[in-house]
Design a protein with these regions (language model features):
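Cys/His-coordinated zinc-binding microdomains
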Residues: 1-4, 22
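Short functional micro-motifs and their immediate structural scaffolds
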Residues: 5-8, 26
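Generic recognition of flexible, low-complexity loop/linker segments
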Residues: 93-95, 132
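Active-site-adjacent beta-strand/loop module that shapes the phosphate/pyrophosphate-binding cleft
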Residues: 95-118
């Protein structure tokens, strides 16, 4: 049972603790995935979000649903947003995202089957395959998205 005492920041962990009853509360974290998909022709699947003014390329991304593994989320988001299947899903890196407790988990994957894109126009304004030479220079390295696209462009993803 929880008491009504005001909680304080724990000195050892990122949590709140009640000094009276010892109850601990960890922050809620919302995991999301982002995936860099490549094909056998050395192309990267890039996207642009629908209804956004930023004219930068992005990658397929989305939040993990309850009861879903990260890898299942990668498969589902790709099928929902662009209608493709992938294999060889591999962890790349992660990044705390925003101030609301999101955690972006990056993956790489290989196209498995057709490269035909079936765009979900409610989510995306554009999705296409680009070679490294077709990707514009990236001077913003603040996000996992930009890092992954840049690393593909320079052959080190």
């Amino acid at each position: 049972e929880k008491c009504e005492e005001k909680t304080t920041h724990d000195k050892k962990e990122r949590m709140m603790r009640c000094p009276s009853c010892g109850n601990t509360m960890f922050p809620k974290i919302s995991p999301a995935i982002i995936v860099a998909v490549t094909d056998d022709h050395n192309r990267l699947l890039v996207t642009k979000y629908a209804g956004r003014t930023k004219d930068q390329y992005a990658l397929v991304a989305g939040f993990v649903e309850i009861g879903e593994t990260l890898e299942e989320c990668v498969q589902r988001e790709l099928m929902e947003e662009v209608g493709i299947r992938v294999k060889d899903i591999r962890y790349y890196a992660s990044q705390p995202w925003g101030f609301v407790g999101n955690l972006m988990v990056g993956f790489t994957a290989k196209l498995d089957g057709s490269d035909q894109i079936h765009l979900d126009e409610t989510e995306l304004g554009l999705a296409r395959w680009l070679t490294p030479e077709e990707i514009p220079e990236i001077d913003d390295y603040s996000s996992l998205t930009r890092e992954m696209i840049r690393r593909f462009k320079y052959g080190c993803l």
